[in-house]
């Protein structure tokens, strides 16, 4: 039995995620296998609007946005694994555990996010996420998302 991996371009990502500029933080999906894992890329540009204030003279990609990029990657994996949502449904970011930041991400870096499906329990799906730059871990966390109807 062979396992089939897939890629996604930005146009396909936009069809799946509700996020838009400047908050769409996944540029391309390099590979994924449904219900297993996904590897995606965020190209970090000095033109990102938050670099004006974070930090002037020493721009650093905000850690919370690294987590958000990984959460968006989990959303893509969930959409591709479970299928399209019913009208009025969304995937919500439901929680995060064990988040650790190992080194800064700066303009010019290419951040690779790898998220791995762990389990679904009581409507929550848990994923392990790791972000790297040049093969070195910059952040890791366990994230949960839930499929729910809009309020």
Swiss-Prot record:
Biological process terms in GO annotation: fatty acid biosynthetic process; lipid A biosynthetic process
Pfam family name, one: FabA
Keyword check for rRNA processing: no
EC number: 4.2.1.59
Main location: cytoplasm
UniProt superkingdom: Bacteria
GO cellular component, one term: membrane
Catalytic function, reaction form: a (3R)-hydroxyacyl-[ACP] = a (2E)-enoyl-[ACP] + H2O
Class of enzymatic activity (EC top level): lyase
Residue positions of the active site: 54
GO MF annotation list: (3R)-hydroxyacyl-[acyl-carrier-protein] dehydratase activity
CDD domains recorded: FabZ
UniProtKB keywords: Cytoplasm, Lipid A biosynthesis, Lipid biosynthesis, Lipid metabolism, Lyase
Localization (cell): Cytoplasm
Family the UniProt entry places it in: Belongs to the thioester dehydratase family. FabZ subfamily.
Role according to the record: Involved in unsaturated fatty acids biosynthesis. Catalyzes the dehydration of short chain beta-hydroxyacyl-ACPs and long chain saturated and unsaturated beta-hydroxyacyl-ACPs.
The protein, known as: 3-hydroxyacyl-[acyl-carrier-protein] dehydratase FabZ
Organism annotation: Erwinia tasmaniensis (strain DSM 17950 / CFBP 7177 / CIP 109463 / NCPPB 4357 / Et1/99)
């Amino acid at each position: 039995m062979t396992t089939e991996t897939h890629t996604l371009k930005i146009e396909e990502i936009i069809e799946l995620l509700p996020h838009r500029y400047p908050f769409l933080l996944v540029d391309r999906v390099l590979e994924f296998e449904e219900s297993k894992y996904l590897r995606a890329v965020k190209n970090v540009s000095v033109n990102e609007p938050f670099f004006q204030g974070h930090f002037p003279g020493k721009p650093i990609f905000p850690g919370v946005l690294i987590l958000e990029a990984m959460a968006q990657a989990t959303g893509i994996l969930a959409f591709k694994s479970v299928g399209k949502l019913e009208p009025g449904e969304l995937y919500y970011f439901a929680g995060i555990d064990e988040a650790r930041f190992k080194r800064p991400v700066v303009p010019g870096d290419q951040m690779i996010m790898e998220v791995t499906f762990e389990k679904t329990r009581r409507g929550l799906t848990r994923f392990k996420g790791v972000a790297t730059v040049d093969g070195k871990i910059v952040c890791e966390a366990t994230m949960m998302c839930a499929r729910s109807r809009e309020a």
